[in-house]
């Protein structure tokens, strides 16, 4: 069960090939099909009670049976697929008169393969099953229940085929001259084939138990070896014989389709045969559905065990959509942290890998409902392939290992969101017209306190995002408003308000959110504070600025340390350069009116350096790349000449 995730094959054909290849060269020549050995006339069951005829397998007698590897037995995830069987199975070439009707040849093949199949069912039920059951009762070396689980409902399948299906086929073929049809017989008995779904659903579990108890119990292995070495078993293992019921329904579908193709256009059996084919197909689909449901619940149970039985996820309504590792972008730490996600159709489990993996591999940190969830890509140069998952309980900034993995995760999230919205009938028409942005902003205000916000990272600001006072480690520490996610100081966040997404518990909020959530008027001291010329919020995103990026600030003008500043030419003030300490700061520490400045190349030796010069003023900058330096020089030359954009996207040079 891998993120993102391996696709499961649609047919058991590959497993049959494994079984074929595991046989000895003496047991079956290369290329010979498993059914060719089983479907010989001498393999037919007796018509009356008495000692069973032994199967003549030629040189296979006495050869040592080969077992199928446990890895293959424990990894069967294949579905029954008639299409795959049509490609892998070809009709048996029958000997007989060349003048025999082609449709009768198919019916003859159906009868012969059914006789061989009943012989194998007899071996499974009356020999393997009964011998193991008798040994379990007498020796107590292994539980009877284990034997019953391994063989599932094989007794019912054997009785149906030996007492009903095979005799009906035999009678109809004997009476073929007077009544040349087979569709009505299959049509009458096809509904009983749905009993195969229980056997197929149990097959993987049976294979696991068989492999386990073969290793665990010497007496269990002794009984198997004795029967497998007999002529009746044909030197084939129990695992090989157990696979035949899984194969049988696709074989019926293949033969019946060929029978319909051979029928004359106006044959009286045309309608009945077609209806019988539809019923056979329905039985195959019933088995497929049983396998799918079994695998889905098995996946849930495996996740349940990996979580240490901490979370109740084994629910018939839950479906695991995707799982895998991601990196969590922290709002305090610089290095992303390893996390693991389990995405279901109705919830996301955000987990932390356990250091000591005794029992459970992961600990559930947060459970987020898919209902009301939003997902979008984060355009973050520092953390590429990152995306935001915003839910009612929590908002996460996550980083994938590649662009393809990020897209795959976002598609999985969006598919789950779309599905649950459709089910809840909550689709609404998207906002149209120029009011779209205003409506979105109003929607965000209305959701304040209803869903967990996206927290601004600590390093993205150097001052309180409400009062613009600089932070320091002793007297003014950073706090996060639990309603809007802003980084604020203690004085601006000295308020408590009940937040619905946190079960109406009181949480620390900033003064603006406190006023919105409670309706209380802000203190006059806060309202009367005048806005300074530098108190212009940083245009951290490209759509808010003509140019923005980090630049190294060089020279005594900036101090000896030469700090790195977030430089912005805003769209709404295109002739001024603002320099911030961090991208999310609400106040710049320097602003430079660019009109009349001269942009020159910096000192020789570093092509990434450029300067702004006017009279006695000189500012020196260093870009991270030459390409970025070229864009900054072009943007500053435009501003210095008095140029300003005439429409919103004109002259956009930002990252």
Curated annotation (Swiss-Prot):
Predominant subcellular localization, coarse grouping: cytoplasm
Keywords per UniProt: Cell membrane, Cell projection, Cytoplasm, Cytoskeleton, Endosome, Guanine-nucleotide releasing factor, Membrane, Metal-binding, Nucleus, Phosphoprotein, Repeat, Zinc, Zinc-finger
Subcellular location: Cytoplasm, Cytoskeleton; Cytoplasm; Nucleus; Early endosome
GO CC field: cytoplasm; cytoskeleton; cytosol; early endosome membrane; Golgi apparatus; lamellipodium; nucleus; ruffle
Pfam families: FYVE, PH, RhoGEF, SOS1_NGEF_PH
Domain DH: 102-290
SUPFAM superfamilies reported in the protein's UniProt record: DBL homology domain (DH-domain) (SSF48065), FYVE/PHD zinc finger (SSF57903), PH domain-like (SSF50729)
Residue(s) carrying Phosphoserine: 11, 48, 654
Chain ranges of zinc fingers (FYVE-type): 458-518
Disulfide pairings: none
Region of interest called Disordered, as start-end residue ranges on this chain: 18-64
Record SMART domains: FYVE, PH, RhoGEF
Binding site for Zn(2+) 1: 464, 467, 489, 492
Compositional bias annotation for Basic and acidic residues: 32-56
GO biological process, one term: regulation of cell shape
Gene Ontology molecular function terms on file: guanyl-nucleotide exchange factor activity; phosphatidylinositol phosphate binding; small GTPase binding; zinc ion binding
Residues that coordinate or bind Zn(2+) 2: 481, 484, 510, 513
Domain PH: 319-418, 544-641
Role: Activates CDC42, a member of the Ras-like family of Rho- and Rac proteins, by exchanging bound GDP for free GTP. Activates JNK1 via CDC42 but not RAC1. Binds to phosphatidylinositol 4,5-bisphosphate, phosphatidylinositol 3,4,5-trisphosphate, phosphatidylinositol 5-monophosphate, phosphatidylinositol 4-monophosphate and phosphatidylinositol 3-monophosphate.
UniProt remark on domains: The FYVE-type zinc-finger is necessary for early endosome localization. Recruitment to endosomal membranes via this domain requires the presence of phosphatidylinositol 3-phosphate or other phosphatidylinositides. The PH domain is necessary for localization to the ruffle membrane. Recruitment to ruffle membrane occurs through binding of phosphoinositides by the PH domain. This domain also contributes to the lipid-binding properties of the protein.
The protein's name: FYVE, RhoGEF and PH domain-containing protein 2
Gene coding for it: FGD2
């Amino acid at each position: 069960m891998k993120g993102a995730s391996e696709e499961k094959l649609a047919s058991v054909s590959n497993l049959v090939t494994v079984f074929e290849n595991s046989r000895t060269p003496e047991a079956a020549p290369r290329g010979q099909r498993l059914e060719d050995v089983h479907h010989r006339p001498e393999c037919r069951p007796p018509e009356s009670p008495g000692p069973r005829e032994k199967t003549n397998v030629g040189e296979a007698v006495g050869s040592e049976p080969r077992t199928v590897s446990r890895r293959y037995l424990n990894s069967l995830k294949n579905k029954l697929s008639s299409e795959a069987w049509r490609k892998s199975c070809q009709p048996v070439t029958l000997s007989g008169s060349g003048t025999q009707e082609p449709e009768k040849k198919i019916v003859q093949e159906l009868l012969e393969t059914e006789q061989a199949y009943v012989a194998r069912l007899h071996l499974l039920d009356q020999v393997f099953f009964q011998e193991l059951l008798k040994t379990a009762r007498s020796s107590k070396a292994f539980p009877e229940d284990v034997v019953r689980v391994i063989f599932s409902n094989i007794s019912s399948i054997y009785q149906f085929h030996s007492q009903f299906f095979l005799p009906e086929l035999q009678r109809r073929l004997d009476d073929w001259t007077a009544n040349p049809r087979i569709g009505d017989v299959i049509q009458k008995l096809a509904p009983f084939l749905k009993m195969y779904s229980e056997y197929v659903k149990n097959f993987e579990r049976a294979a696991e138990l068989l492999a386990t108890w073969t290793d665990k119990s010497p007496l269990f292995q002794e009984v198997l070896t004795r029967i497998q070495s007999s002529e009746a078993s044909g030197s084939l293992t129990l695992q090989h014989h157990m696979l035949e019921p899984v194969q049988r329904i696709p074989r019926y579908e293949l033969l019946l389709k060929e029978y319909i193709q051979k029928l004359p256009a106006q044959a009286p059996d045309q309608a009945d045969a077609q209806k019988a084919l539809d019923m056979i197909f329905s039985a195959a689909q019933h088995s497929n559905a049983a396998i799918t449901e079994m695998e889905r619940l098995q996946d849930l149970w495996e996740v349940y065990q990996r979580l240490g039985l901490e979370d109740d996820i084994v629910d018939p309504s839950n479906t695991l959509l995707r799982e895998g590792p991601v990196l969590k972008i922290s709002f305090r730490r610089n290095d992303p942290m390893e996390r693991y996600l389990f995405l279901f159709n109705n919830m996301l489990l955000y987990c932390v890998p356990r250091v000591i993996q005794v029992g459970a591999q992961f600990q559930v940190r947060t459970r987020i409902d898919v209902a009301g969830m939003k997902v979008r890509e984060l355009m973050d140069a520092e953390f590429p392939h990152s995306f935001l998952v915003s839910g009612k309980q929590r908002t996460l900034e996550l980083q994938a290992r590649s662009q393809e993995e990020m897209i795959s995760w976002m598609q999985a999230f969006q598919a789950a969101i779309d599905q649950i919205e459709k089910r809840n009938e909550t689709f609404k028409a998207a906002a149209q017209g120029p009011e779209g942005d205003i409506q979105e902003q109003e929607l965000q205000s209305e959701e304040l306190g209803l869903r967990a916000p996206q927290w601004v990272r600590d390093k993205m600001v150097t001052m309180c995002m409400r009062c613009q006072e600089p932070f320091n480690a002793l007297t003014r520490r950073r706090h996060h408003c639990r309603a809007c996610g802003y980084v604020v100081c203690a004085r601006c966040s000295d308020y408590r308000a009940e937040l619905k997404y946190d079960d109406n518990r009181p949480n620390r909020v900033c003064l603006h959110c406190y006023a919105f959530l409670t309706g209380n008027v802000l203190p006059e001291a806060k309202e009367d504070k005048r806005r300074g010329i530098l108190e212009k919020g940083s245009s951290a995103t490209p759509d808010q600025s003509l140019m923005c990026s980090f630049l190294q600030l060089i020279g005594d003008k900036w101090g000896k340390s030469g700090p790195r500043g977030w430089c912005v030419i805003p769209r709404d003030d295109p002739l001024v350069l603002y320099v911030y300490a961090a991208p999310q700061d609400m106040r710049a520490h320097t602003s430079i009116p660019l009109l009349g400045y001269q942009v020159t190349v910096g000192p020789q030796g570093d092509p990434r350096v450029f300067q702004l010069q006017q009279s006695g003023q000189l500012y020196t900058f260093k870009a991270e790349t030459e390409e970025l330096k070229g864009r900054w020089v072009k943007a500053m030359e435009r501003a210095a000449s008095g140029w300003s954009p005439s429409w919103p996207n004109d002259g956009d040079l930002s990252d």
